[in-house]
């Protein structure tokens, strides 16, 4: 999958898809917004935010 710009609800939806039942921590302070919204991120990078 190509890198994507993911912001707000799109970012949360992508985390649900990637993490599934594991759940995830959505903390803007963790740099996920910086990484995925201001720049682009891959699904592989999103997995770093799963629990």
Curated annotation (Swiss-Prot):
Q: Which domain of life is it from?
A: Eukaryota
InterPro entries reported in the protein's UniProt record: Insulin, Insulin-like, Insulin-like_sf, Insulin_CS, Insulin_family
Keyword check for Disulfide bond: yes
Q: Which cysteines are joined by disulfide bonds?
A: 7-37, 19-50, 36-41
One of the record's GO molecular function terms: hormone activity
Q: Which UniProt keywords apply?
A: Carbohydrate metabolism, Disulfide bond, Glucose metabolism, Hormone, Secreted
Subcellular location per UniProt equals: Secreted
| Any one of the GO CC terms | extracellular space
Key word Disulfide bond present: yes
Could you mention a single GO BP entry for this protein? glucose metabolic process
Subunit text: Heterodimer of a B chain and an A chain linked by two disulfide bonds.
The text of the family note is:
Belongs to the insulin family.
Q: What does this protein do?
A: Insulin decreases blood glucose concentration. It increases cell permeability to monosaccharides, amino acids and fatty acids. It accelerates glycolysis, the pentose phosphate cycle, and glycogen synthesis in liver.
* The protein's name: Insulin
Q: Which organism is it from?
A: Meleagris gallopavo (Wild turkey)
Q: What is the lineage of its organism?
A: Eukaryota, Metazoa, Chordata, Craniata, Vertebrata
